[in-house]
Curated annotation (Swiss-Prot):
Induction text: By sulfur deprivation.
Family the UniProt entry places it in: Belongs to the NmrA-type oxidoreductase family. Isoflavone reductase subfamily.
Predominant location: cytoplasm
Name listed for the protein in its UniProt record: Isoflavone reductase homolog IRL
PANTHER family assigned: ISOFLAVONE REDUCTASE HOMOLOG IRL, PINORESINOL REDUCTASE-RELATED
Described function: Reductase that may be involved in a late step of alkaloid biosynthesis.
Keyword rRNA processing in record: no
Subunit and partners: Monomer.
EC number: 1.3.1.-
Gene3D superfamilies per the UniProt record, alphabetical: NAD(P)-binding Rossmann-like Domain, UDP-galactose 4-epimerase, domain 1
Gene Ontology terms: biological process: alkaloid metabolic process; cellular response to sulfur starvation
GO MF annotation list: NADPH binding; oxidoreductase activity
Length: 309
């Protein structure tokens, strides 16, 4: 007899990635709850999203990250807590850690990660300070003795691929493409729904407990030059490539306003430093989602780019 699926609570479920996590949890058969501040919002788009959750069998729990009683109550009904809170609330996840510790019943916690592996990044400021908050939540989780999985996913496809890998461009290249570094460093692009699927699959998997879950599908690991060549093949056009050396990238980061400097710093970490791919996974600390779940039919970069033709 198959073991019963864990009850999953999603915090931040109405956000950009969170809605995918809620949908994946319900689709994969988990009793799923979403913590929401308002179960009947006046905003039509938010109301439609919540209705789609309910139609999928998701329970809406009225609560707030800043209301500890409601937070503890929500956590007590869950086996697994997945946080998908945005960058402005990363540090405030300490409240969630406290609630999980107080409730005492959670078997796995996924803090809001889904980008670079914050324990091994050399990313420059101002992004360094933002990722530092994620490091703090990791240490707080471990100190509290809470079983965890840290999901690391590289670039969201919805951010990186519409511009064909260009960091600051408004859209696909028209006549030229701006490339950070030499363009040969490999990066990872993952469709948001696939990030959610791999994350939820790991929720009940003992192999992912107290490990970093690296989500880097093989067909979606490619350099900026390879990405541009793929786009050229699809469009039948050739684009002039303007390569920006690292020194110029660092200077641009220092001189650009927020949020452009943060976006550039992340691009520098991925495309110049190779932080999404330039390492071997230490099996004592991490697992490869593609190896754990080889049957997942993920959206390839090749397929994703067809949306823009």
């Amino acid at each position: 007899m198959a073991s019963e699926k864990s009850k999953i609570l999603v915090v931040g479920g109405t956000g950009y990635l969170g809605r995918h996590v809620v949908a994946a949890s319900a689709r994969l058969g988990h009793p799923t709850s979403a913590l929401v501040r308002d179960t009947a919002p006046s905003d039509p788009a938010k109301a439609a999203l919540l209705k789609s959750f309910q139609d999928a069998g998701v329970t809406l729990l009225k609560g707030d990250l800043y209301d500890q009683a409601s937070l503890v109550s929500a956590v007590k009904g869950a086996d697994v807590v997945i946080s998908v809170l945005g960058s402005m609330q990363i540090a405030d996840q300490s409240r969630l850690v406290d609630a999980i510790k107080e409730a005492g019943n959670v078997k796995r916690f996924f803090p809001s990660e889904f980008g670079l592996d914050v324990d091994r990044t050399g990313i420059v400021e101002p992004a360094k300070s933002i990722l530092g908050a994620k490091v703090g939540i990791r240490r707080a989780t471990e100190a509290a003795g809470i079983p965890y999985t840290y999901a690391v996913a590289g670039f969201f496809a919805g951010f990186g691929l519409p511009k064909v890998g260009q960091v600051l461009a408004p859209g696909p290249p028209a006549d030229k493409a701006v490339v950070l570094g030499d363009g040969d460093t490999k990066a990872v692009f993952v469709e948001e729904g696939d990030i959610a699927t791999y994350t939820v699959l790991a929720a009940d998997d003992p192999r992912a407990e107290n490990k970093v879950l690296y989500i880097k599908p093989p067909a979606n690991t490619l350099s900026h030059n390879e990405l541009l060549s793929l786009w050229e093949k699809k469009t039948g056009k050739t684009f002039r490539r303007e390569y920006v050396p690292e020194e110029a990238v660092l200077k641009q980061i220092q001189e650009s306003p927020i949020p452009l400097n943060i976006i550039l710093a992340i691009g520098h970490a991925a495309f110049v430093r190779g932080e999404q791919t330039g390492f071997e996974i230490d099996p004592a600390k991490g697992v490869d989602a593609s190896e754990l779940y080889p049957d997942v039919k993920y959206t390839t970069v090749d397929e994703y780019l067809n949306r823009f033709l």
